[in-house]
Amino acid sequence: MGRWHRTGLLLLATVFSSSAWALEFRSILSDRTVMYDTPSLRGKKLYLASRYYPVEVIVSLEHFAKVRDVAGELAWVEKKRLSEKRMVLVNVSLADVRQAADENAALVFQAERNVALELLEYTNTGWLKVRHPDGATGFVRISQVWGT
């Protein structure tokens, strides 16, 4: 096998392995979205999900997506019920949202466990810029939310 052939194969393997590990998150588009045990409207209805609830897409079919929620539970949902809007869910008792991506920055607001926040921007500092449903924006530690 030639040197360039091996290099090309290594490059392809790297590209495909890194993209295979990329996480795809979406949020639920509307309140009372039915989550199913199979990719069919005839499947067993497992629970209802609320608007903005973040989910991780595991499998994507033509009309359905298999998703994982914050608890690790798997379910199927109609793809048309998913939004591109990125949301994160507070996974600690009380998350501090600050004016800047700094522990010493002024506190803008606090969000309780299970509050959904819109993800506005990633930083490379361990913080995310988020927006509360009431419109307030700030930075939250990535360790205090799920959905990234």
Positions of predicted regions on the chain:
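SH3-family beta-barrel domains
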Residues: 20-37, 45-51, 58-136, 140-148
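Bacterial N-terminal signal peptides that target proteins for export
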Residues: 1-9
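Bacterial N-terminal signal peptides
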Residues: 8-17
